[in-house]
């Protein structure tokens, strides 16, 4: 299972990638 902190980090990276893609 993935630790919560690592899961949150992956989520943040995905959000940043989407934000960069939309800009």
Curated annotation (Swiss-Prot):
Keywords: Cytoplasm, Hydrolase. Signal peptide: none annotated. Optimum pH is 7-8. One of its GO terms (cellular component) is cytoplasm. GO terms for molecular function: hydrolase activity. Its EC number is 3.1.3.-. The keyword Transmembrane does not apply. It comes from the Bacteria. Its main location: cytoplasm. It is found in: Cytoplasm. Homodimer. This is NADP phosphatase 2.
């Amino acid at each position: 299972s993935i630790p919560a902190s690592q899961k949150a980090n992956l989520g943040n990276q995905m959000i940043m990638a989407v934000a960069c893609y939309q800009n």
